[in-house]
Regions:
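Positively charged n-region of N-terminal signal peptides that target proteins for export
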Residues: 1-4
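C-terminal segment of classical bacterial N-terminal signal peptides
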Residues: 14-22
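N-terminal leader/targeting pre-sequences
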Residues: 24-152
């Protein structure tokens, strides 16, 4: 009897664990996307962390990291979306820009405003997404490639 109760308890915990992870985005998972320099802009490394939680309060989060960029510099990173065009062949819409300031070593980080579920209502499907970092003269200095992002 103790063995049956132990197995039942373990099965219940496993079910709870599976149910809680199933609420995360099944179509698009968290991804770290590399930022690459445009022309000769200095950059040791850079990335965008794109997180799709698909929660009732938070649909998505984004984090931005620069390492070895220009020191003590102001940048802005733009989220651009090619709506229903996962190849990024057509025109893009710029959804928002987020400021990033670097320290004396050229390192900086920032996060986008939380994206609520209602902001993506009606956009279910595949989209081409890329991120572009602009310097204070509004010139693109870093960018990602085209990422195929599926919203569900």
């Amino acid at each position: 009897m103790k063995k049956i109760l132990a197995l039942t308890g373990a099965a219940s915990l496993l079910t709870i664990g599976v149910a809680s992870t199933a609420s995360a985005d099944r179509a698009y998972h968290t991804e770290r996307v590399t930022l690459l320099p445009v022309d000769d802009a200095p950059l040791r490394s850079g990335s965008v962390v794109n997180i799709h939680a698909n929660g009732p309060q938070v649909y998505a989060l984004e984090r931005y990291l620069l390492n070895g960029a220009l020191p003590n510099h102001e940048y802005e990173i733009a989220l651009t979306v090619h709506v229903f065009d996962p190849t990024c062949a057509g025109p893009a819409l710029e959804f928002f820009r987020v400021p990033i300031s670097t320290n004396r070593a050229g390192n900086g980080h920032a996060k986008a405003p939380t994206i609520p579920p209602e902001a993506v209502a009606g956009l279910e499907g595949a989209h081409g997404v890329n991120w572009i970092v602009y310097n204070d003269a509004d010139i693109a200095v870093y960018e990602t490639g085209c990422e195929d992002v599926v919203l569900d």
